[in-house]
Protein backbone atom coordinates (compact mmCIF):
# COMPACT_ATOMS: atom_id res chain seq x y z
CA UNK A 1 0.00 0.00 0.00
CA UNK A 2 1.47 3.35 -1.00
CA UNK A 3 1.93 6.27 1.37
CA UNK A 4 -0.60 8.29 -0.66
CA UNK A 5 -3.26 5.57 -0.37
CA UNK A 6 -2.60 5.15 3.34
CA UNK A 7 -2.84 8.88 3.95
CA UNK A 8 -6.08 8.99 1.94
CA UNK A 9 -7.56 6.33 4.23
CA UNK A 10 -6.39 8.28 7.29
CA UNK A 11 -7.90 11.47 5.83
CA UNK A 12 -11.20 9.62 5.29
CA UNK A 13 -11.21 8.50 8.94
CA UNK A 14 -10.42 12.06 10.04
CA UNK A 15 -13.29 13.41 7.88
CA UNK A 16 -15.61 10.86 9.50
CA UNK A 17 -14.53 12.01 12.97
CA UNK A 18 -15.07 15.64 11.94
CA UNK A 19 -18.64 14.76 10.91
CA UNK A 20 -19.21 12.98 14.24
CA UNK A 21 -17.70 15.77 16.39
CA UNK A 22 -18.52 19.28 15.16
CA UNK A 23 -15.78 20.87 17.32
CA UNK A 24 -13.28 19.26 14.92
CA UNK A 25 -14.68 21.08 11.85
CA UNK A 26 -12.00 23.79 11.98
CA UNK A 27 -9.15 21.28 12.45
CA UNK A 28 -6.77 20.15 9.69
CA UNK A 29 -4.89 16.90 9.16
CA UNK A 30 -1.40 17.12 7.64
CA UNK A 31 1.72 15.02 7.17
CA UNK A 32 5.16 15.93 8.45
CA UNK A 33 8.62 14.37 8.36
CA UNK A 34 9.12 13.52 12.04
CA UNK A 35 11.29 10.45 12.51
CA UNK A 36 11.00 9.85 16.25
CA UNK A 37 7.26 10.25 16.78
CA UNK A 38 4.18 9.01 14.98
CA UNK A 39 1.84 11.97 15.32
CA UNK A 40 1.30 15.26 17.08
CA UNK A 41 -1.61 17.52 18.02
CA UNK A 42 -1.17 21.30 17.85
CA UNK A 43 -4.21 22.58 19.79
CA UNK A 44 -3.61 26.30 19.23
CA UNK A 45 -3.11 25.78 15.49
CA UNK A 46 -6.02 23.29 15.34
CA UNK A 47 -3.83 20.88 13.42
CA UNK A 48 -2.97 17.21 13.70
CA UNK A 49 0.11 15.90 11.88
CA UNK A 50 0.97 12.28 11.14
CA UNK A 51 4.56 11.43 10.23
CA UNK A 52 5.22 10.50 6.60
CA UNK A 53 7.66 7.85 7.89
CA UNK A 54 5.03 6.44 10.25
CA UNK A 55 2.67 6.07 7.29
CA UNK A 56 5.43 4.49 5.19
CA UNK A 57 6.56 1.94 7.79
CA UNK A 58 3.40 0.83 9.58
CA UNK A 59 0.08 -0.88 8.92
CA UNK A 60 -3.08 1.13 8.35
CA UNK A 61 -4.53 -0.05 11.68
CA UNK A 62 -1.47 1.28 13.56
CA UNK A 63 -1.69 4.60 11.68
CA UNK A 64 -5.42 4.92 12.42
CA UNK A 65 -4.69 4.23 16.10
CA UNK A 66 -2.22 7.14 16.00
CA UNK A 67 -4.89 9.36 14.44
CA UNK A 68 -7.37 8.37 17.17
CA UNK A 69 -4.73 9.18 19.82
CA UNK A 70 -4.23 12.67 18.35
CA UNK A 71 -7.96 13.33 17.79
CA UNK A 72 -8.52 12.47 21.46
CA UNK A 73 -6.04 15.26 22.29
CA UNK A 74 -8.01 17.63 20.06
CA UNK A 75 -11.33 16.73 21.71
CA UNK A 76 -9.89 16.95 25.23
CA UNK A 77 -8.57 20.41 24.38
CA UNK A 78 -11.70 21.69 22.63
CA UNK A 79 -14.21 20.37 25.17
CA UNK A 80 -12.26 20.39 28.45
CA UNK A 81 -9.30 22.72 27.81
CA UNK A 82 -6.99 19.82 28.69
CA UNK A 83 -3.62 19.12 27.10
CA UNK A 84 -1.47 16.06 27.70
CA UNK A 85 -2.55 12.56 28.63
CA UNK A 86 -4.97 13.43 31.43
CA UNK A 87 -8.32 11.91 32.40
CA UNK A 88 -10.31 13.61 29.62
CA UNK A 89 -7.84 12.44 26.97
CA UNK A 90 -8.00 8.88 28.37
CA UNK A 91 -11.80 8.93 28.24
CA UNK A 92 -11.84 10.27 24.67
CA UNK A 93 -9.23 7.87 23.30
CA UNK A 94 -11.14 4.93 24.81
CA UNK A 95 -14.47 6.23 23.49
CA UNK A 96 -12.95 6.56 20.00
CA UNK A 97 -11.78 2.95 20.11
CA UNK A 98 -8.10 3.51 20.81
CA UNK A 99 -5.83 2.42 23.62
CA UNK A 100 -5.13 4.93 26.39
CA UNK A 101 -1.35 4.57 26.09
CA UNK A 102 1.14 7.41 25.85
CA UNK A 103 3.44 5.55 23.45
CA UNK A 104 2.60 3.03 20.80
CA UNK A 105 4.36 0.05 19.32
CA UNK A 106 5.37 1.09 15.82
CA UNK A 107 8.31 1.07 13.43
CA UNK A 108 10.53 4.12 13.04
CA UNK A 109 13.10 4.80 10.30
CA UNK A 110 16.62 3.52 10.75
CA UNK A 111 19.10 6.11 11.94
CA UNK A 112 22.08 7.06 9.80
CA UNK A 113 24.47 7.61 12.70
CA UNK A 114 25.56 6.02 15.97
CA UNK A 115 27.00 8.24 18.71
CA UNK A 116 29.88 6.32 20.32
CA UNK A 117 32.42 6.73 23.10
CA UNK A 118 35.86 5.51 21.98
CA UNK A 119 37.57 3.66 24.81
CA UNK A 120 41.09 2.46 23.91
CA UNK A 121 40.36 -0.42 21.48
CA UNK A 122 36.58 -0.40 21.69
CA UNK A 123 33.47 1.63 20.83
CA UNK A 124 30.57 1.98 23.27
CA UNK A 125 27.24 2.86 21.67
CA UNK A 126 25.59 5.81 23.43
CA UNK A 127 22.69 6.70 21.12
CA UNK A 128 21.37 6.51 17.58
CA UNK A 129 20.90 9.75 15.65
CA UNK A 130 19.30 10.85 12.38
CA UNK A 131 21.60 13.90 12.17
CA UNK A 132 25.09 14.75 13.38
CA UNK A 133 25.68 17.66 15.75
CA UNK A 134 28.56 19.80 14.49
CA UNK A 135 29.81 20.52 18.02
CA UNK A 136 30.44 16.89 19.00
CA UNK A 137 34.12 17.54 19.80
CA UNK A 138 32.98 19.75 22.71
CA UNK A 139 30.62 17.11 24.15
CA UNK A 140 31.35 15.12 27.29
CA UNK A 141 29.50 12.38 29.11
CA UNK A 142 27.60 13.77 32.10
CA UNK A 143 29.94 14.08 35.06
CA UNK A 144 32.89 12.85 32.96
CA UNK A 145 34.96 15.82 31.74
CA UNK A 146 37.71 13.32 30.84
CA UNK A 147 35.57 12.15 27.89
CA UNK A 148 35.95 15.42 25.97
CA UNK A 149 37.27 14.53 22.51
CA UNK A 150 36.32 10.84 22.91
CA UNK A 151 32.78 11.06 21.47
CA UNK A 152 32.30 10.36 17.77
CA UNK A 153 29.70 9.63 15.13
CA UNK A 154 29.99 6.43 13.11
CA UNK A 155 27.72 5.51 10.22
CA UNK A 156 25.20 2.86 11.26
CA UNK A 157 26.46 0.53 8.52
CA UNK A 158 30.09 0.80 9.67
CA UNK A 159 29.13 0.36 13.32
CA UNK A 160 27.24 -2.86 12.49
CA UNK A 161 30.18 -4.07 10.37
CA UNK A 162 32.58 -3.37 13.27
CA UNK A 163 30.26 -5.11 15.77
CA UNK A 164 30.09 -8.21 13.57
CA UNK A 165 33.87 -8.30 13.08
CA UNK A 166 33.76 -7.36 9.38
CA UNK A 167 35.73 -4.16 10.09
CA UNK A 168 38.65 -3.53 12.41
CA UNK A 169 38.38 -0.49 14.68
CA UNK A 170 41.19 1.13 12.67
CA UNK A 171 39.00 0.83 9.54
CA UNK A 172 35.99 2.57 11.10
CA UNK A 173 35.62 6.25 10.15
CA UNK A 174 35.21 8.18 13.42
CA UNK A 175 33.65 11.58 12.77
CA UNK A 176 33.83 14.57 15.11
Where in the sequence are the language-model features?
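Metalloprotease/metallohydrolase-associated module, dominated by Zn2+-dependent proteases
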Residues: 2-61, 78-176
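Active-site recognition of the HExxH zinc-binding catalytic motif
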Residues: 65-77
